[in-house]
Regions:
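Thiamine diphosphate
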Residues: 1-172
Length: 172
């Protein structure tokens, strides 16, 4: 199984049915896999904080969901975490495809990558970086269970070591 197929299986095992996302190349296998599987309800959002609001509303209605985004999209999320998700005790699951590392060319991605983890720490939001197929299912499963049990959000950061990252072409 590919990393994305394994990830979707873990979501099913944890009753996660709603997949909200802002389109991203690295996340395409997850997005397409969820869209092609009748178990999941996929909803495209225009912004990451909008996707988080959709997941929050779904949680209040009894439906469990996740938000898929890339690193730069995380920049709009801290206010939604601090003003809605954390105080309302919503166990939102955020999945971030990591850019800004390992040869990144886009300074915007680099800057957000540098502040993402310190921002999550400042908000007391749990986060885990997924780097390999062997540990990924365990970390995802336990992170979802902990988020639900503690009514707290969790951020799962998908390292390029797991996903292969975005392929860059060198310009000469």
């Amino acid at each position: 199984m590919t990393w994305s197929e394994t990830f979707l299986t873990v979501l099913k095992n944890n009753d996660i049915k709603l997949v909200t996302y802002v389109p991203d190349n690295v996340l395409t296998p997850l997005i397409k896999g969820a869209a092609d599987d009748p178990y999941f309800k996929s909803v495209v959002a225009t912004r990451e904080d909008e996707a988080l609001g959709i997941v929050a509303g779904a949680w209040m209605a009894g439906l469990h969901g996740i938000v898929l985004m890339q690193t730069s999209g995380f920049a709009v999320v801290p206010n939604a975490l601090a003003s809605l998700i954390v105080p309302s005790q919503i166990p939102a699951i955020l999945v971030v495809s990591e850019r800004g590392t390992l040869g990144e060319f886009n300074i915007g991605q680099v800057l957000v990558s540098r502040v993402m983890r310190p921002t999550l720490d400042a908000l007391a939001v749990a986060h885990h970086t997924l780097t390999d197929d062997a540990t990924m299912p365990f970390i995802v499963d336990r992170s979802i269970k902990q988020a639900v049990a503690t009514q707290s959000p969790v951020v799962l950061i998908l390292s390029p070591l797991l996903t292969g990252g975005k392929v860059f072409t060198e310009k000469m």
